[in-house]
Amino acid sequence: MRNWLRKKIKSKLKDYKVAINTVDATLPKHITTQKKVAIVGGGIAGLSAAANLAERGFDVTLFEKNEYLGGKVGSWKFESKGETLQVEHGFHAFFRQYYNLRNFMKKIDVYKHLIPIDDYIIFYQNGKQQGFAGIDNTPGLNIFDLRKKGVLDFWTFINPMSMSFLKLLRYHPVKTFEKYDGVSFEQFAQQTAMPKHMRLVFNSFARAFFAEPHKMSLAELIKGLHFYFLSNDDGLIYDVLNDDFEHTFLKPTERFITQHGGKIQRNTAIDSIEYTDGKFIVQNDTFDYCILSLDVKHLKPLIQNSKGLEKYPLIQNNTNAIKCTDRYAVLRLWTDSFESNKTLPFFIFTDRLKCLDSVTFYHKMEKESAAWSATNNGGIFELHSYSLPDSLTKDEDIKQQLQDELFHYFPELKSMQIKHEFFQHRDDFPAFHLNQYKQRPTVQTEIPNLFFAGDWVKLPVPSMLMEAAYTSGAMASNFIFNKENLQENLLESVYGYGLLAKE
């Protein structure tokens, strides 16, 4: 019976992979006349656009405000007590359905650095653990199998209020947002009498998008669940890089861009651009195309300060409407101690007491961290709060609270000595809050040669986080290829409709 259902579900979901665009193989791939492209913002979206365009012969200049590339996957060195250490923006997971990003990683020969994580684990406040290894990976059947893990029970399936859970299987790229973008996950959980353990699991999932349950758009959550859990048979098991992002991803991407003639200007903050006579002026140079791939926090003032964009109300209104999400914090600790449970995966979610949402064990995951750990006989822990409460505003208070909650889950670490630390308190992640979707900008804009790219852009496919960032940059490149009568690059996605949705 299960095998029959698996086949039916796979067929309904188009074998879990569909093409986003149609490639005309009769068109040329490389441009033969000089066309200059300015890309502002060197995160994954900007790197994606730069790599795709430079490979085809475009004269690409990528402007990045920081010394390092990568944006939210950035990696850099810092000095502490006479040591030079590597740190990153924070932990990132490469899920198996990140089709476009992973294809690019294969192209630049960094796919080999991916290693699998064993389980998706949540630590509850009472000391119990929730894992997801062993459940059926087939969409729909995986929800039914949650009963094996105590997330659901028999009464959940026969409770009339639980019928509302079916909307999770009805993701629709238009109707879902029309109906549920103004409903919070908190409201949904209360209306459906969601079981406690299921709610804790969903709370952790919602916070992974840097939003509290009462602020998180139910439509965005349904899209996220569809993308990660209900559109493919890879389950929640994912891969991570086996060393820091600079060496395993960012340097190889930079080499790919520059080897194809692209230019990268670091430490170059672009505060404004000028649009005149159908072209863009950036840093006193003139460009045929411009891609804005900054984070939301820096995009909005750039749009407001730029000349020639004030005539375009959609650009002005839509960029003004999008928001940054709540403040978040990342604290990495180099210590003289280890967790006692050596069987844990590299990363765990925690049922926060006040602010701790996850712990990453870098000494188990990355080569450089493992080498430091072996030399210094201590673990490297990253503590992450995806959404800080309003009551925590001071850096020292946040750091102390994160450590206190770490000790709650790992009391054996209470006596640890901290040899080094690196703390980040930021507010630059895009909000997926209530009623944000309608005015969210798309890749194409009112100006035919201006494009947006980033994890904040509205895409025609249910893509999120790193995959959304990469895909948006690749889509911007494809639009430029199309304008120049060049062959597009094939892009792929999970199927854009839920198991019970009608097209």
Residue ranges and their predicted role:
Residues 32, 165-272, 276, 286:
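Active-site/ligand-binding neighborhood in enzyme catalytic cores
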